[in-house]
């Protein structure tokens, strides 16, 4: 039986770069119509593309941004709100927005990572918004492929070269600082922080909490659990209450953890805020908790619009210098906190038994 002829390998943008003797970024700039390429280099790229019968489809790239949610559930309320903001900006600029989800390990070499098929070159995608939980290896992969991207700076885990990338972030350190100062202004001194400091966002918020506690002359009280979401808050709070430690207020690292804090406090027979005041972070769960949760509001839709604006700008100018934008947060006060009377200085168990 005659062997079937092997199909020729598909030409990739890497082949164009190799034949032209230029970088992937240079080929990408030519493809997107950037004016930051010398005529000589542009000619070499176009000649190589013609020889390889490779279409540099710059037109299509100018109108589509990919929103990639990495290593997060697609129903995550925080990132869903960021997506809404990105959609609003893209609609205002007559730009398409494509939602993609991917999961990858932070320890996988970037050469072994696989992008969603539509991002393999040639692609109509002009730039990418990286939301969810990301790490340096994916940033290296996008850089190697010459794909312009903007990353949410708060959610990059591990060591990363922040100065090399365009990013939008919110000031979670200052947000946690404000929340802790607020609790102290109500008379609280036994203020615990609940979070998983293996994650950079929890660690930064702990830094803000610690700064406030030091300024007030109080020792930081940390219960650090390697968990996520509601389980994190629930297990950490159960542990605190089990020890009999004095606690009048808890700063939860995010609202999902705060939901677990509520559950543990209620199971132990205590009341919020009569026995323990609670503050969350992100302001995504307030309406579904009873009493409504005091939380640090992150302007998620503004973040989405800002990331989309940065990405849109880099479609036509992929060689722009990295830019980092920081958005402030806002403490939203609700019914989960109350002033602590100066006479209420006994440990929690003693206060409850005296009722």
Model-flagged regions — what are they?
Residues 67, 121-131, 190-195, 223-224, ...:
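Periplasmic-binding protein-like
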Residues 6, 220-221, 236-355:
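Flexible loop/turn connectors
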Residues 48, 85-89, 141, 204-216, ...:
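Alpha-helical structural signal in soluble globular domains
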């Amino acid at each position: 039986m005659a062997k079937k002829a092997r199909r020729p390998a598909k030409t990739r943008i890497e082949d164009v770069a190799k034949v032209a003797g230029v970088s992937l970024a240079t080929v990408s700039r030519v493809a997107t119509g950037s004016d930051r390429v010398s005529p000589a280099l542009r000619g070499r790229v176009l000649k190589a593309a013609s020889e390889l019968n490779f279409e540099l489809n710059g037109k299509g790239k100018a109108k589509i941004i990919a929103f990639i949610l990495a290593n997060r559930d697609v129903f995550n309320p925080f990132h869903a709100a960021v997506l809404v903001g990105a959609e609003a900006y893209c609609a205002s600029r007559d730009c398409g927005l494509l939602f993609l989800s991917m999961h990858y390990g932070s320890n996988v070499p970037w050469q072994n990572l696989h992008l969603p098929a539509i991002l393999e070159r040639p692609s109509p995608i002009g730039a990418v918004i990286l939301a969810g939980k990301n790490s340096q290896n994916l940033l290296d992969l996008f850089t190697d492929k010459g794909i312009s991207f903007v990353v949410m700076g708060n959610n990059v885990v591990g060591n990363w070269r922040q100065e090399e990338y365009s990013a939008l972030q919110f000031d979670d350190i200052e947000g946690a600082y404000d929340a802790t100062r607020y609790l102290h202004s109500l008379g609280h001194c036994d203020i615990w922080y609940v979070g998983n400091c293996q994650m950079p966002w929890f660690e930064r918020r702990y830094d803000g909490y610690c700064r406030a506690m030091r300024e007030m002359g109080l020792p930081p009280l940390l219960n650090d659990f390697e968990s996520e979401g509601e389980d994190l808050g629930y297990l950490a709070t159960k542990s605190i209450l089990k020890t009999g430690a004095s606690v009048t207020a808890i700063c939860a690292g995010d609202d999902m953890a705060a939901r677990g804090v509520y559950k543990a406090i209620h199971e132990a027979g205590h009341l919020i805020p009569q026995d323990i005041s609670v503050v969350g972070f992100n302001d995504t769960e307030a309406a579904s908790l009873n009493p409504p949760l005091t939380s640090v509001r992150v302007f998620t839709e503004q973040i989405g619009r800002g990331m989309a604006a940065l990405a849109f700008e880099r479609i036509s100018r992929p060689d722009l210098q990295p830019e980092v934008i920081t958005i402030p947060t806002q403490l939203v006060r609700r019914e989960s906190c109350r002033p602590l009377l100066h006479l209420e200085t006994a440990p929690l168990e003693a206060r409850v038994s005296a009722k």
